[in-house]
Amino acid sequence: MALRAGEHSQEAANGLKEKVLTLDSMNPYVRRVEYAVRGPIVQRALELEQELRQGVKKPFTEVIRANIGDAQAMGQIPITFPRQVLALCVHPDLLNSPDFPDDAKRRAERILQACGGHSLGAYSISAGVQMIREDVARYIERRDGGIPADPNNIFLSTGASDAIVTVLKLLVTGEGRTRTGVLIPIPQYPLYSAALAEFNAVQVDYYLDEERAWALDVAELRRALRQARDHCRPRALCVINPGNPTGQVQTRECIEDVIRFAYEEKLFLLADEVYQDNVYAESSQFHSFKKVLTEMGPPYAAQQELASFHSISKGYMGECGFRGGYVEVVNMDAAVKQQMQKLRSVRLCPPTPGQVLLDVAVSPPAPSDPSFPRFQAERRAVLAELAAKAKLTEQVFNEAPGIRCNPVQGAMYSFPRVQLPPRAVQRAQELGLAPDMFFCLRLLEETGICVVPGSGFGQREGTYHFRMTILPPMEKLRPLLEKLSQFHAKFTREYS
């Protein structure tokens, strides 16, 4: 446990030299950083798991971590072909094994030829293996209907988070009323608030419309921008599509409106598109900001600055631990792009295993390849099950009194709104907790279900939510949803 300020004098009294680095002397901006997805509730979940291993009796037999979008931690089986290619790259002696298909061997040989010393253990260039960047560019071109993508505008990264933080770092400048402001959606993914706190930038909240399935309204963007200009200099706008934690998928019309707004107000656009393969609602379709921007033509296509992000952690692969991703920049100033390259160089290079898996993600087996039937079957099975889980989650929550869940159109989460009795709110305040944090802690202690309170993502005053992944196996998901709904009913009776 960290020392509090008043404990330093006790050190001196004991004849110990005061530490150079203390809570008082450390970077104050780091102290302000919060990351709810791995916050106090998750720490308590770890403690409960340890207690269960030690034989301590609980009202449950396991902790179900529905707090984070980690598919394989929740039981998803890895897709075979990417792992075969990775195994061959890590241990090239396996290239002589009859246990691996020929197309996986060809892919591994091609990747190894592009690596320094023909080994995955060598550093790549800081922007990532050039051949893989070229494959990413071809993927983007296919995705966007033939719109060109330049590999020199693509930087591979240690997951999308690493790239997002890099771009934010480029944007942050100024002091006082000239500090950089960044518009982020509320509810938001806490990476953004954490990074802005660390960089001493200003978080400018714009609220998604819960009554319209978490729609993004340009009128709300204008309100947020107008108020922010009184105390900072807004320079960037972030959009998460499909949404995290809210699961909505933006329409093309909405994206066009956002691009016009950003252009008119001279805002750099950050498009967090890591869930682009996770679209479940039949009425929804993913549209990339790059494609829409280009098809809008001048002046937007040639002038609006954009950084778009993707990752191997989500989609159908769920390879979170290998940390692979990329950012594509559009219309970025050439001198700034050089500075971005410099920042990447300081970090040496993204992990090469993550780069390998990214290459397979953007260039999967073709229909003529021997691995295609199995790959396609596994991919479709994962996405079909996620779609079924999204529908089930919405259905069960909306049948429970006091819980309302918008359609989970995409991504990997539901973000239901829960009604909490006034006495529960009062009790939470007495304990110094946010009301939904109090609810989620009680839920964890009594059921073993670990979810993240909505206050960790931001929400309108007087509303309470939690984020829950839809990733648990179907045989566990329905009982989990029913148990959670039953707990809410019990909690409501207790505090009514």
From Swiss-Prot:
UniProt modified residues of type N6-(pyridoxal phosphate)lysine: 314
Pathway entry: Amino-acid degradation; L-alanine degradation via transaminase pathway; pyruvate from L-alanine: step 1/1
Main subcellular localisation: cytoplasm
UniProt-annotated location(s): Cytoplasm
A cellular component term, taken from the record's GO annotations: cytoplasm
Modification type Phosphothreonine: residues: 22
Cofactor dependence: pyridoxal 5'-phosphate
Name of one Pfam family that matches: Aminotran_1_2
Keyword Lipid biosynthesis listed: no
A biological-process GO annotation: biosynthetic process
Family matches, as PANTHER family: ALANINE AMINOTRANSFERASE, ALANINE AMINOTRANSFERASE 1
Stated role: Catalyzes the reversible transamination between alanine and 2-oxoglutarate to form pyruvate and glutamate. Participates in cellular nitrogen metabolism and also in liver gluconeogenesis starting with precursors transported from skeletal muscles.
Protein name: Alanine aminotransferase 1
Species name: Bos taurus (Bovine)
